[in-house]
């Protein structure tokens, strides 16, 4: 979807949107205002600021996942979107990993070592945690390397 000003962007924003590209200087509403509205709504999207405004220390508190200074090539923009997709995947996997680790921790506190060792489901949980840890590490490496290439 494409919106030509901040107000249109907010009108079209719903749960099916995964990534938002904003400019700090947009008609009707600034990118910062749109970003504040997105945060207020609690919409789970990755946001990149693509703008001619050079970054300053204020970006530290800006709720964006990436900040790109124009002019931007199509290849760079595609790379930004791909990186944000990877960040979303990373966040999802990290959330799943944390939930599984919390369950494991509860079981380790509440069950005896022999009970844990005898449980096939607990062994499966351990394997799931190990696999997710590997996936999270690989995604983290991918994000870092794509950042360096830019």
Annotate each PLM feature.
Residues 2-11, 31-33:
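Helix N-cap/capping motif at the beta->alpha junctions
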Residues 53-66:
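Alpha4 helix (beta4-alpha4-beta5 surface) of REC/receiver domains from two-component response regulators
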Residues 15-21:
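Active-site beta3 strand of CheY-like receiver
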Residues 70, 74:
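A Lys-centered signature of the CheY-like receiver
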Residues 27-28, 41:
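The feature encodes the CheY-like receiver
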Residues 22-24, 30, 51:
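Active-site residues of response regulator receiver
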Residues 77-91:
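Receiver (REC) domain switch/output surface
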Residues 90-150:
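C-terminal output/effector regions of signal-responsive regulators
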